[in-house]
């Protein structure tokens, strides 16, 4: 049986390991997940330098590619299981090349903590961030 990620999580900034680009400006964050296998919906708000940045997505955990177009960019999204972790990947094809963003979501401490390992590649801003959230 796969874990259920549903819940509301608050960023634990001191427990997170963030890149030199993000660390100085990351202040707080909330991650809300609705997970009814195979449907996974996430809404995240991260406050960077006093400004909230929101991101939302809804995907199925079947690993199939979902292709969308947004603002002249082609985005290929996938969500798949890797053991008990869920991995979401976006490949963004734009006029300046390709950027790949992935998050590996894992529950820890009996579901009280969510670890989100982010990897960004391309666009001249490669970075790795380990975001740690505590269940509210």
Q: Which sequence ranges carry the predicted segments?
A:
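Hydrophobic small-molecule pocket/channel-lining residues, especially in calycin-type beta-barrels
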Residues: 1-136
